[in-house]
Amino acid sequence: MRSGGDRCAANVPPVGARSWWLDEALKADPGEPCPPLAGETAADVCVVGGGFAGLWTAYELTERAPGIDVVLVEADICGAGGSGANGGFFSCSWHMVATLCHFFGEDEGVRYAKALADQVDELDAWVARHEADIEAHHEGILYAQAGEWQDPPDPEGQKILARHGYADRLRVVEAAGARRYAGSPRFVGGAFTPDLATVQPAKLVRELRRVLLGRGVRIYERTPLKELLPGRPATVVTPAGRVRADQVVYTVGAWAAGHPHWRRAFAVARDFMVVTEPIPERLREIGWLTHVGIADSREMLYYLRRTDDDRVAIGGGAMGAMYDGDLDGDGPIARFARTSPRLAEVPARGLVWLFPQLEGVRFEAAWSGPMDVDRAGVPFFFTAPSGNLHAGLGFSGHGLAATKAGGKTLASLALGADDEWAHLPVVGPPLTLVPPEPLRWPLLQAVSWLMETGDRREEEGRPRGLVRRAAQRVFDAYCAARPTSAHG
């Protein structure tokens, strides 16, 4: 007899080429067409990439310098990459403040965490100002401990927040407190922060696009970058045109792995999500009445949330590593990492494991989204020695609030502003580098598989044992390379 999780996984449809979020957003409002670039043009700033980082950068530029001439080029349509395919968690980083402090020092780590938390409040004001329909719910997130085997809230992070007057921003909860948000019998505790909003990510992309077009930003979709020629002005070369710009901002996310300069800066992986049919009655039965986001505390965590039409969207639990950053190839590794039925079934099984009450639920869509995975788990913002080429990369699947803050940083760098955003601790080269191929893919794939296997053993009541030690050894090998350059 198949388990409930296996029966649930059997209901998962094939992995789609576009996310359910983007399909729904385009149905609601296809928006004004943005044709490809044809011919030559000039601009004060050219933004390369139409995801959140590029769109927020263009927004900040036009906010601070009305009348500035901004061109944005996007290889597909705005939001076709990770920005339109994620969980829609516009979140702070209080839960990882100890990690931030490890890399940046305590004062700077807390300053960056506070900057991200502020973006959540600012999003509320942005939505009201622009009358943006992005299905935003600023209700917080529960970092659930779904079983005694999962890590409890980090006590070191709690101490750091208390020292800086932010103890109330991440509150430890017991089992009853965790289950108040949603009635999972797995929840034994966790931590809650109010500093998160769930959004429909593709609708946020489309609303940003709408606002920018209204401000006179020239957006060229289906216009991939072929070459970036340094100089003053710099030249962005596309298949049928060129943009000469005083400043260029490079925000192509995971696709930057194809550029020699960033090949060692991060690994590229795809995360999988599924979404259920509308199940309002079943959600009421388990007490899931709010739009609080939820993430558990396994090594390959699940993240999940309600939608406005009473579905559950869940992702995580596994990932598909891309060989040498090959996101668009047709080889077996690229196809598996992009469309694997097995990887799509992992979050589907996870939903029924977390909520056995939802056994038999039908899933309506499955998709995957690319991530530029920095080993430190934090982005970096870099200006080339020429002074007029800037990049924001490495968002590592935590990019919604980080790209809004990052847009401020990249705008400051492009405008030459000497302000707090130009001096965030994430401004500079990547903190860590990843191994070269052909080592990177097998090491990353092995780490992912071992962590997923260990989580599954714990779910079944078996200890990780040798799996934990093997995962640690492979991860240590992955982290061992410490070259002096991101090249090659």
Where in the sequence are the language-model features?
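Extreme N-terminal leader/targeting segments of oxidoreductases
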Residues: M1-V45, E63-R64, I68-D69, H95, ...
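Glycine-rich Rossmann-fold phosphate-binding loop(s) that bind the pyrophosphate
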Residues: G49-L55, A75
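Internal hydrophobic alpha-helix adjacent to the cofactor/substrate pocket in enzyme cavities
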Residues: T62, A402-L424
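Glycine-rich FAD pyrophosphate-binding loop
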Residues: T62-A85
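Glycine-rich active-site loop/strand segments that organize a redox cofactor
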Residues: A85-A115
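Active-site substrate-recognition segment that forms the wall
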Residues: G88, R129-H137, L225-E227, P233, ...
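Rossmann-like flavin
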Residues: F103-V211
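Helical element adjacent to the flavin cofactor pocket in flavoenzyme catalytic cores
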Residues: K159-I160, P185-Q247, T251
